A protein has these predicted regions:
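Short, flexible, glycine/charge-rich loop motifs used to bind or transfer phosphoryl groups or to couple energy/partner
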Residues: 45-53, 107-111, 138-141, 210
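Short glycine/serine/threonine/alanine-rich loop segments
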Residues: 1, 86, 237
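Conserved beta-alpha-beta core of the PfkB/ribokinase-like small-molecule kinase fold
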Residues: 57-140, 147-149, 157-159
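Residues that scaffold the ATP/ADP-binding catalytic core of kinase and kinase-like folds
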Residues: 31, 68, 129, 170, ...
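Conserved phosphate-binding/catalytic region of the ribokinase-like
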Residues: 79, 134-259
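Conserved N-terminal subdomain of the carbohydrate kinase-like
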Residues: 1-62, 249-259
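Short gly/ser/thr-rich secondary-structure transition/capping motifs
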Residues: 36-45, 98-104, 131-132, 208-209
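Short low-complexity, flexible loop/linker segments enriched in glycine and/or proline
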Residues: 18-22, 104-106, 136, 166
Length: 259
């Protein structure tokens, strides 16, 4: 992992998430550290323009949008990445306990959705943002916010994707659930890596993303489903993420979910 642009803040701590899991593998985010966390102290002056010149994708979430200076720094980072031709990936990852109130969270996320080329949310977040869980509402949200690629993860059922030209549910995989922490992050990584295989050499990655065929998108989401599924077969977040060899073997031998 390249940590060239990692910044240490002597006055702040790394934000921690505390996760409680049941014997069935279901999880609940019990709490986060909230006071003097380094991620909330990111400033525009911390951003290195050279970093974006060599990048292909910028991925961000909504926690950095809760308050300044991180909110303005995040928006500036998106602008800088866009200027350098990066794809913008956004997983709002709603954590209401960190926000002053739910309405501020909803408003902020809706305002920031148009910044992104790729947005990933789950069914609970879809209902939070639109008032319902129907996939038709997801397609309406994509159109309203002009999002080139919107993905709704559906737990064991897989994931739904919608672009301007295509929409489809891609089935998930049958697994023995151990613990689900890190599944969403793994899914995001699978999507980004899959997209880059198709669009990284294009002079206009956003246009290349929009031109992907249904079969190409289906293959990308299937791979992402595989990464997310494998992340659920081990305890922990980072330790559960698979190697390429593990992923290839899983995709070639595993059965899709019957749900």
């Amino acid at each position: 992992i390249d940590v060239t642009c990692t910044i240490e803040d002597p006055l702040a701590q790394t934000r921690m998430a505390y996760v409680v899991t049941t014997s069935e593998g279901d999880r609940k985010l019990a709490d986060f550290t909230r006071i003097a966390c380094a991620d909330a102290r990111l400033e525009i002056e911390d951003l290195d323009e050279e970093l974006f010149a060599g990048a292909k994708v910028l991925h961000f979430g909504s926690i950095s949008l809760i308050e300044n200076p991180a909110r303005d720094a995040t928006k500036k980072a998106v602008e800088m990445a866009r200027e350098k031709g990066c794809l913008i990936s956004y997983d709002p990852n709603v954590r209401l306990s960190l926000w002053p109130d739910p309405q501020q969270c909803k408003t902020t996320i809706l305002q920031s959705l148009p910044w992104a080329d790729i947005v990933k949310i789950n069914e609970v977040e879809l209902e939070f943002l639109t008032g319902g869980k129907e996939l038709a509402q997801a397609e309406a949200l994509r159109e309203e916010m002009n999002i080139p690629l919107l993905i709704i993860t559906l737990d064991s059922r897989g994931a739904f994707f919608a672009t301007e030209r295509h929409s489809k549910i891609v089935s998930g995989f049958q697994i023995e659930l151990v613990e689900a922490t890190g599944a969403g992050d793994g899914f995001n990584a699978g999507v980004i890596r899959g997209l880059l295989k198709h669009v990284k050499e294009s002079p206009d990655r956003r246009a290349a993303l929009k031109s992907l065929e249904e079969s190409e998108m289906e293959a990308i989401i299937r791979t992402a489903n595989g990464v997310g599924a494998l992340a659920c077969t081990k305890a922990g977040a980072i330790p559960a993420l698979p190697s390429q060899e593990e992923l290839d073997r899983f995709l070639s031998t595993s059965k899709v979910s019957a749900n």
